Swiss-Prot record:
Keyword terms: Coiled coil, Repeat, Transferase, Ubl conjugation pathway
Source taxon at top rank: Eukaryota
PANTHER family listed in its UniProt record: U BOX DOMAIN-CONTAINING, U-BOX DOMAIN-CONTAINING PROTEIN 11
Function statement: Functions as an E3 ubiquitin ligase.
Protein's UniProt keywords contain DNA repair: no
GO biological process: protein autoubiquitination; protein ubiquitination; regulation of stomatal closure
Gene: PUB11
Signal peptide (UniProt feature, chain positions): none
EC number(s) on file: 2.3.2.27
SUPFAM superfamilies per UniProt: ARM repeat (SSF48371), RING/U-box (SSF57850)
Protein name, entry field: U-box domain-containing protein 11
Length: 612
C-alpha cells in the first residue's frame, strides 16, 4: 500500500500521537486545537483506504506515491510543530512569533496540497468520507487565507538553513530578508486574521521550512502582497507613530481600538485572544477585569484615521474619514443596547423589538449592532420569561448571524446552550427561528462539532416530526448541515431521525419534504447505525418507487442511498433487483446528472455481479 512508502495503519498511529499531544495553554491554544481537529478529520479516510482494495492495482503508482509522500510530510510536520508550540510562553519575542506563525502556515499549506492530490480513482472511497476530506480541505484553505500565501520559489533555498534564534537576518540576504519580514507582518497582522492572529511562539527552531514548501505556491499573489507591504513599511519607518496609537500588546498601529474594563485601550483582535486564552487581568495594569466587555474607542479611531490621512498611509477599511458607517445610527443603536439591560420588562421588550427591526434591514445595521455590544446582552435575553422578549431576541440573533463575522461573536457569547433551550421550550415561532439560527451558525465547520455536542440534535428531530411546515424545513436544513460532520450522525440516529425521515417518504401529506428527507438520508446512509435503521424501516420499496419518478434530484439521492445500503450485501442487491430497480437505474445512467449516472452505473455493476 502507498507504493511502499508508508501504510495507512502507520499514519493512523501518527494521527493518534498528534491527538495525544497536550494542547498549548497560552497564546497558541486555538491554533494548536484547530490544527489537531483538522488532522482528526483524516482518520476515517485512512481507515477506509486501509480496509479497501485498490480499484486498479495495475495502475501507475506515481500519483499515489506523490500524495502519500505529501501527506506523510504534512502529518510529521504537524506533530513536530504541535509538540514544540505547546511549550511557548505568552511573553515570547515578536521574532519568535513570526517564525512559528510561518510554520503554522507551512504545515497548513502542505496538508491542503496533499489532500488536493488525493487519487480518488485508485480507491473505493465512499461519499461520506469524501465529504469529510472536502470539509478538512475547506478548513485548511480558510486557514491559509487568514495566514497569507507562500512564495517557495524565492525562499526555498534560503529557508533550507536552520532558523536562527534572533530572527531571519542570518538566514537570507538583505533584500530577501526585507520581503520575508513583510510576509511575516502580513501573515501575522492581516485584516482577515483579526480573530485568529498568530500569537508569540518559541524562541528557536531548527526545522527547515523548505521541507514544507514546493515550487507551485502562489508566487504572483505573494509578490503583490509583499511589494504593497514593503512600500507601506518604508512609509511608516520614516514616521514616528504616536505611542497612544499603538496597541500595548502588539506594538502595532491599531485598526480597531477597544476599551476594556480598566480603561486601557487595545487592538480588538489581540485583547480578544488574550481573554479567550483564559486571562482575567488587564495585560498592561494586571488589574482584574470586572467584565469582558470591549467598548469601541471611536475617538481614538477617528484620530488614527485622521493621522493616517495626513501622512498618506492607507487607512484601515471601514474607518475612512474617521467614521464607522453612520455615526448617527451608531448613537441610536448604542442607546437601544443600553435599554436591553433596563430593569423594566416593557423597556427591554420595546428595545429588542426595535433592534430586531434594524437587524433585518441591512448588513450595515448588523455590523453596527454587533459593534455596540448587543450580542452578549441578546444572548442573556434568550432565557427571558417574557415570551415576546424571547421571540424577538432569538430573531435578532438569527438576523445578526447572517453577517459572517458575527457568527464567531455569537459563539463566543456562549449562545448555543440558550438557543437549544429556546428550541426545546419556546413558542413555535421562537423554536423555528432557533432552528434557523443553528443552521446559520453551523455553516462554519468548527461550529458543527460544538452544536452537535450541545443537545441540539434531539430537539431538532422533535421539531422535524412535530413542527409547522416552516419549522420542519428549518429543522431539516439544520440537521443536514450538522450531519455533514461524521460525529453528529450517530447522535441523529439515536435521536430517531431515520424514523422521521422515512415517514416523510411514505406520507403523502408530507410530499413537499421528500427532497429534504432524501438529501439527509443520503448523508446518513454510510453510517452503520443509520444503515441498519433505514433497512429496518423497510425503506427499499419506497426508494425504488422514487427511482421511477421524474424528479432528477430525488432519483439521484435515492440511487446514492441504495448504493450505500447494498454495497457488499448480495441479499439486498437481489431484493432491489426483484423490486424492479434495473430499468429506472438504466434510465438514470443515461439521462441523469453526472453524480446520478455514476451512482446508477455503480449500482448496476453490483447487480450484475450479484446475479452471476
Amino acid at each position: 500500500m502507498a507504493g511502499g512508502i508508508v501504510s495507512p495503519a502507520s499514519l493512523l498511529d501518527l494521527i493518534a500521537d498528534i491527538v495525544e499531544i497536550p494542547l498549548n495553554t497560552g497564546m497558541f491554544k486555538k491554533d494548536c486545537a484547530d490544527l489537531t481537529r483538522r488532522v482528526c478529520l483524516l482518520t476515517h479516510l485512512l481507515e477506509e483506504i486501509r480496509d479497501s482494495t485498490p480499484i486498479d492495482s495495475a495502475a501507475s503508482s506515481s500519483s499515489e506515491n506523490d500524495w502519500w509522500s505529501d501527506l506523510v510530510v504534512g502529518l510529521q510536520a504537524a506533530k513536530r510543530l504541535l509538540s514544540t508550540a505547546r511549550f511557548q510562553a505568552r511573553d515570547s519575542s515578536d521574532g519568535a512569533a513570526k517564525r512559528i506563525s510561518f510554520q503554522f502556515q507551512c504545515v497548513t499549506w502542505k496538508l491542503e496540497k496533499a489532500l488536493s492530490n488525493l487519487p480518488y480513482d485508485l480507491y473505493d472511497i465512499s461519499d461520506e468520507v469524501g465529504e469529510q476530506v472536502e470539509l478538512a480541505r475547506s478548513q485548511l484553505r480558510r486557514a491559509m487565507q487568514r495566514y497569507g500565501s507562500l512564495n517557495s520559489n524565492k525562499f526555498s533555498s534560503a529557508l533550507s538553513e536552520p532558523m536562527e534564534r534572533d530572527g531571519f537576518s542570518n538566514v537570507i540576504k538583505i533584500k530577501a530578508e526585507e520581503k520575508l519580514e513583510s510576509v511575516s507582518e502580513t501573515l501575522h497582522f492581516g485584516e482577515e486574521e483579526e480573530k485568529q492572529s498568530s500569537p508569540p511562539l518559541r524562541r528557536s527552531s531548527s526545522i527547515s521550512l523548505a521541507y514544507y514548501l514546493s515550487k507551485d505556491a502562489d508566487t504572483d499573489r505573494l509578490d503583490k502582497m509583499v511589494n504593497k507591504n514593503t512600500d507601506e513599511s518604508k512609509k511608516s519607518d520614516k514616521l514616528t507613530i504616536p505611542v497612544d496609537f499603538l496597541c500595548p500588546v502588539s506594538l502595532e498601529l491599531m485598526k480597531d481600538p477597544v476599551i476594556v474594563a480598566t480603561g486601557q485601550t487595545y487592538e480588538r483582535a489581540y485583547i480578544q485572544r488574550w481573554i479567550d486564552c483564559g486571562n482575567l487581568t488587564c495585560p498592561k495594569t494586571q488589574q482584574k477585569l470586572e467584565n469582558f466587555t470591549l467598548t469601541p474607542n471611536y475617538v481614538l479611531r477617528s484620530l488614527i484615521s485622521r493621522w493616517c490621512a495626513e501622512h498618506n498611509i492607507e487607512q484601515p477599511a471601514g474607518y475612512i474619514n474617521g467614521r464607522t458607517k453612520n455615526s448617527g445610527d451608531m448613537s441610536v443603536i448604542r442607546a437601544l443596547v443600553q435599554r436591553l439591560s433596563s430593569r423594566s420588562t416593557e423597556d427591554r421588550r420595546n428595545a429588542v423589538s426595535e433592534i430586531r427591526s434594524l437587524s433585518k434591514r441591512s448588513t450595515d445595521n448588523r455590523i453596527l449592532i454587533a459593534e455596540a455590544g448587543a450580542i452578549p446582552v441578546l444572548v442573556n435575553l434568550l432565557t427571558s420569561e417574557d415570551v415576546a422578549t424571547q421571540e424577538n431576541a432569538i430573531t435578532c440573533v438569527l438576523n445578526l448571524s447572517i453577517y459572517e463575522n458575527n457568527k464567531e461573536l455569537i459563539m463566543f457569547a456562549g449562545a448555543v446552550t440558550s438557543i437549544v433551550q429556546v428550541l426545546r421550550a419556546g413558542t413555535m415561532e421562537a423554536r423555528e427561528n432557533a432552528a434557523a439560527t443553528l443552521f446559520s451558525l453551523s455553516l462554519a465547520d468548527e461550529n458543527k462539532i460544538i452544536i452537535g455536542g450541545s443537545g441540539a440534535i434531539p430537539a431538532l428531530v422533535d421539531l422535524l416530526e412535530n413542527g409547522t411546515p416552516r419549522g420542519k424545513k428549518d429543522a431539516a436544513t439544520a440537521l443536514f448541515n450538522l450531519c455533514i460532520y461524521h460525529g453528529n450522525k450517530g447522535r441523529a440516529v439515536r435521536a430517531g431521525i431515520v424514523t422521521a425521515l422515512v415517514k416523510m417518504l411514505s406520507d403523502s401529506t408530507r410530499h413537499r419534504m421528500v427532497d429534504e428527507a432524501l438529501t439527509i438520508l443520503s448523508v446518513l446512509a454510510n453510517n452503520q447505525d443509520a444503515k441498519s435503521a433505514i433497512v429496518k424501516a423497510n425503506t427499499l420499496p419506497a426508494l425504488i418507487g422514487i427511482l421511477q419518478t421524474d424528479q432528477t434530484r430525488n432519483r439521484e439521492n435515492a440511487a446514492a442511498i441504495l448504493l450505500s445500503l447494498c454495497k457488499r450485501d448480495t441479499e439486498k442487491l437481489i431484493t432491489i433487483g426483484r423490486l424492479g430497480a434495473v430499468v429506472p437505474l438504466m434510465d438514470l445512467s443515461k439521462n441523469g446528472t453526472e453524480r446520478g449516472k455514476r451512482k446508477a452505473i455503480s449500482l448496476l455493476e453490483l447487480l450484475r455481479k450479484a446475479c452471476q
